[in-house]
Amino acid sequence: MALSWKSFVNVPGILADLRSFNFSVYGRWFGYINILLCLALGIANIFHFSIVIAFAIVAIVQGLLLIFVEVPILLKICPLSDNFIGLVKKCDTNGRRTLLYTALAIVQYASLSVQVTSLLAVAIGLTISAIFYGTGYLKKQEFLEGNVIRNPTDPAFMREAAVREVL
């Protein structure tokens, strides 16, 4: 039994998300992009010989925080403190995510006062997520989880036998 990405990714669910016009879903998609931006550009900027290193480290930490905010299943998998889990679980509404992303973006915009670097892309990405979550909050839209990963009850979801075969 061959494994494919379609075993894990719910393509019809992704298309339904895009057609939903729910801004919390769009904010979550940009949140995934922000995770990659924060980690990649944080690592890339850590090689500067100025105070930009501090902002690069902050970007990496922001990326790690966003992983747990945007992929809540990791809170159950990873051994974390109860305080951290409680903090992340507080970000479960459009309004709170708007505030979180705005605060993270402000920190990265502050890095521009030292030197203009690629961390500007991180700040812009965080701002876009904040705008999407803020729009969802102002429109009083329900906060939705995305449909990217298949539900284990889905018949197309990979079963234990396939997992054993991979291992």
Swiss-Prot record:
Glycans are attached at N22. It is a multi-pass membrane protein. It comes from the Eukaryota. The chain crosses the membrane at residues 27-47, 49-69, 98-114, 118-138. It comes from Eremothecium gossypii (strain ATCC 10895 / CBS 109.51 / FGSC 9923 / NRRL Y-1056) (Yeast). InterPro entries: TVP18/Ca-channel_flower. Golgi membrane protein involved in vesicular trafficking. Keywords: Glycoprotein, Golgi apparatus, Membrane, Transmembrane, Transmembrane helix. It is found in: Golgi apparatus membrane. The gene is TVP18. The keyword Ubl conjugation does not apply. SMART domains: Cg6151-P. PANTHER family: CALCIUM CHANNEL FLOWER HOMOLOG. Belongs to the TVP18 family. This is Golgi apparatus membrane protein TVP18. The keyword Transmembrane helix applies. GO terms for biological process: vesicle-mediated transport. One of its GO terms (cellular component) is Golgi membrane.
